Amino acid sequence: MFDFQINAHCSHTRARVGCFRTPHGSVNTPRFMPVGTLATVKGITATQLADTGAQMVLANTYHLHLQPGEGIVADAGGLHRFMGWDRPLLTDSGGFQIFSLADLNRIDDHGVVFRNPRNGSQIELTPERAIEIQMALGADVAMAFDQCPPYPASESDVETACKRTHAWLERCSNTHQHANQALFGIVQGGCFPHLREQSAQIVASFGLPGIAIGGVSVGEPVEDIHRIVRQVSPLLPQDRPRYLMGIGTLREIAIAVASGIDLFDCVLPTRLGRHGTALVAGERWNLRNARFREDHTPLDQSCTCTACRHHSRAYLHHLIRNEELLGLTLLSLHNLTQLIRFTSAISQAIQDDCFSEDFAPWQPDSAAHHTW
């Protein structure tokens, strides 16, 4: 039911091209996954999302548990039918949101107790419960419940979070029984190399269909992200997809691909779009800027998104300045298309064995600007 096949390697880096097969179709890697927190990528229909080239979408267990509840989603026939998306889906465990957003009342080895932000009631979430919720949601991939330490955190606190994450992974693995759903484990360890190495080895020992690197992009310097990815990726099984959580800039994606990462997700492209910002040739353009008022050219002549095929910069500027919802949707679609085109271009470069040359300007030791 689940299979990951590597089809090409870069001869100069660890970059690779693969295909992750799921019950709802295949995901060609490397691949960026749009974030559909509440079973929707904000302001975008499933048909529009498919037109961006998206092959897999991430939804949020924490938020869906609070509203509408996994029971309603299950009664609808699962998350795919509920949101009208017939391609692969991934649900996170909710751990990151609980530890970063929720009003925590208790955390211990058993699980966490937090206050429902909607009605003030107390909710207990354990590894078993997190998996039960995700099985009810029915995505193709479920993520293990983990403890994501903040940045900065002491070595002692990060070590405690790692031990808890590994113990919880065992409980998640024992609870997970869903033939049409793959369980991914999550490597933690903060910015401490020995804890990252230990976590990678322990999580890999479970033999799960895929592994994620978590606890990055939580406030640490980007140099630490690069170092963590370069260290951890080679320690993970070669024949399983590797997922770097919460990364969504072109530079960080290119650097991570060079280290052998396959999957990425981030709210950044749609969040930027909703705030009137477009990603163009690696830059961020604020469409509220007056310089676009009389510019009747497309955002990007080479882009295939709806905004670039049918509308001008002047029109998008007009929509954004007047707070028209269509403008936010068009920019979100454009930004997603840019990220997905970027990973597709990387994939082709790896297959042509020119990734290290074509994407060299994106690497940490280069200050050059690259257009594509």
Curated annotation (Swiss-Prot):
GO terms for biological process: queuosine biosynthetic process; tRNA wobble guanine modification; tRNA-guanine transglycosylation. The active site is at 92 (proton acceptor), 265 (nucleophile). It comes from the Bacteria. Binds 1 zinc ion per subunit. Pfam families: TGT. InterPro entries: ArchSynthase1/Queuine_TRR, TGT, TGT-like_sf, tRNA_ribo_trans-like. Keywords: Glycosyltransferase, Metal-binding, Queuosine biosynthesis, Transferase, tRNA processing, Zinc. Zn(2+) binds at residues 303, 305, 308, 334. Pathway: tRNA modification; tRNA-queuosine biosynthesis. HAMAP family: Q_tRNA_Tgt. Belongs to the queuine tRNA-ribosyltransferase family. NCBIfam families: Q_tRNA_tgt, tgt_general. Catalyzes the base-exchange of a guanine (G) residue with the queuine precursor 7-aminomethyl-7-deazaguanine (PreQ1) at position 34 (anticodon wobble position) in tRNAs with GU(N) anticodons (tRNA-Asp, -Asn, -His and -Tyr). Catalysis occurs through a double-displacement mechanism. The nucleophile active site attacks the C1' of nucleotide 34 to detach the guanine base from the RNA, forming a covalent enzyme-RNA intermediate. The proton acceptor active site deprotonates the incoming PreQ1, allowing a nucleophilic attack on the C1' of the ribose to form the product. This is Queuine tRNA-ribosyltransferase. It comes from Prochlorococcus marinus (strain MIT 9313). The gene is tgt.
